[in-house]
């Protein structure tokens, strides 16, 4: 079950309000959701309210952000977004180190095989 943090449309005609929810990828836009993570009202002076701790919790567990939800989290909870980015960068560094070590092992094995073949 893939999870996504996305906006769910609410409100009435000409005054749409959105809820930031955690939902299954296959559920409809305005359908069933797992957890309410905040809201966004583009017409109000107080535009949004987000539950930063819960957003971070679900992002750590593998939930993905939709593009609009990502923009809202960047604006409303920059600490959560920067922590997520730093975690992703740390993972990339680990993968790069492993890849470098693997390439180095392979090149030394090839060199040794070439030396053995010439003997």
From Swiss-Prot:
Residues 108-119 have a biased composition (Basic and acidic residues). Gene3D superfamilies: 3.30.1320.10. It comes from the Bacteria. InterPro entries: Ribosomal_bS16 (IPR000307), Ribosomal_bS16_dom_sf (IPR023803). GO terms for molecular function: structural constituent of ribosome. Keywords: Ribonucleoprotein, Ribosomal protein. It holds the Pfam family Ribosomal_S16. Residues 96-119 are annotated as: Disordered. One of its GO terms (biological process) is translation. Belongs to the bacterial ribosomal protein bS16 family. This is Small ribosomal subunit protein bS16.
